[in-house]
Amino acid sequence: MQFDSLPLPPSSSHDTTSVPPLKRHAACDECRKRKLKCSGEATGCSRCLKQSLPCHYSLQKPMGRPPKKRPREDNDASVYEITDNGMWADIDDGGILTEEAGAEATAASDALRLCPPVYTAPMRMPQAFPNLLSTDDSHNHLWQLESGRSLDPIPATTGPWPDFSSVTAATSSPFTLPSSLTLIDSPSVSSPSSDGGNSSQCTCLSYLYLCLSHLSSLAPFPISQHTLCSLFIAAKTARAVIRCEVCPTSFALGMQNVMFTGTLLNVIADAWLRVSQADAEELGKLAAPPAYVASVTQNSPNPAEAWKDWLRQTVRSAITGGPADPAGQVKCSDSPTLLSLIEEMEARQHRWHRTRTVESPNEPGSCSPVSHEDHREEDMLCFRVIRSARDVIAKFEFAPHEYPEGVVPV
């Protein structure tokens, strides 16, 4: 390893070698922080420009080991006032100290090298797939699942979902699927065999896991039209998984279906709550149809209030199915409402318990057929998970008239 020699004072230095220019990182700070591929334009990378994020290329730190036991010129207290970006800079740039102060500063600098301070910062979720946030042209807004059809194996797509056709693409996700879940073989409803079993695997768990992973990867980014489209697609995925006919044939599959679907419904509810608190005008100009944007800009006496009303209608339509102006509907908004998914899952759990199709031990509080008279069905784990999603809907504070006719307000 090569070490740089200590710099000499300008008056006594005879080295005529020019100082090498400072180099900047090839990727911007935002892409490096999320571990994404950066396009590297000096004026701003494509991802930062698309997400309206500050694009800054920080300087590379000098390579090599810092010089040891370099005397300092400042007082003792400044030894401990070191920032995380320049931990060794103060030590390198110091001058000559007195003998006593130099010994104390040297001891402190050695202690910092042996036990450097730990700096905490909010954890950012790394973006596993660079094409999750694509433009409107590449979004597959017409993606939908037929009501009577089971989930097929995940195909390659150019839509808002990444390519999960290969194992390497799926394993680059920021989460690691527990080994206990990957070892469970679940049959499919497509082609039952002669012995009563099914030949292929059920893909519900894969869809749920990838859907949750995708939604979590959007959390660090500002709310945009891509967020709304992802939430609508997630609702379609939840509906297809709720209607799966394979999961109730096994207790393990049924429990995974209940827990992951309940988690997905809670994540969708929390995400819509975050959308409702976003800047209505900024989001509306990104997500609403161009004709509606022009109409609000030109004809509305108070555009700010008009955009707030549009955002309220959009969120209400996605949560409860309440009335909304068709002219301002977002693309791919033809998805089931969150409240309808909760009600459908509750009805499914009642049906599972009543028909006793899930084979499970009769444990109190488990998602199993009601076998003990002293345990209420509402206290079972599956209903408690669903109830937590209802609690999030209550935070929207929708008035009774904002619910469709025949829907019980939350």
UniProtKB/Swiss-Prot annotation:
SUPFAM superfamilies: Zn2/Cys6 DNA-binding domain
UniProt keyword list: DNA-binding, Nucleus, Transcription, Transcription regulation, Virulence, Zinc
Keyword Cell wall biogenesis/degradation appears in the UniProt entry: no
Recorded GO CC terms: nucleus
GO MF term list: DNA binding; DNA-binding transcription factor activity, RNA polymerase II-specific; zinc ion binding
UniProt superkingdom: Eukaryota
Transcription in keyword set: yes
UniProt xrefs under InterPro entries: Stress_Response_Reg, Zn2-C6_fun-type_DNA-bd_sf, Zn2Cys6_DnaBD
CDD domains: GAL4
Subcellular localization, as worded in the UniProt entry: Nucleus
Deleted gene: phenotype: Leads to high sensitivity to allyl alcohol, a compound indicative for potential defects in carbon catabolite repression (CCR), but does not affect growth in non-stress conditions, nor in the presence of 2-deoxyglucose (2DG), an additional indicator for defects in CCR. Also leads to sensitivity to acrolein, menadione and t-butyl hydroperoxide. Abolishes the production of gliotoxin (GT) and accumulates bisdethiobis(methylthio)-gliotoxin (BmGT). Leads to reduced expression of gliZ, gliT, gliF and gtmA in GT-inducing conditions.
Coiled coil: none
Listed PROSITE patterns: ZN2_CY6_FUNGAL_1, ZN2_CY6_FUNGAL_2
Comp. bias (Polar residues): 358-369
Main location: nucleus
Region described as Disordered: spans on this chain: 1-24, 353-372
UniProt DNA-binding region: 28-55
Any Gene Ontology biological process: positive regulation of transcription by RNA polymerase II
Function: Transcription factor that is involved in protection against oxidative stress. Binds to promoter regions of the gliotoxin (GT) biosynthetic genes gliZ, gliF, gliT, gliM, gliA and gtmA. Two related but different DNA motifs (5'-TCGG-3' and 5'-CGGNCGG-3') are specifically enriched among rglT binding sites in GT-inducing conditions. Also indirectly regulates the expression of gliP, gliG, gliH and gliN. Plays a key role in resistance against exogenously-added GT and GT biosynthesis, mainly through the direct regulation of gliT.
Name of the protein: Transcription factor rglT
UniProt source species: Aspergillus fumigatus (strain ATCC MYA-4609 / CBS 101355 / FGSC A1100 / Af293) (Neosartorya fumigata)
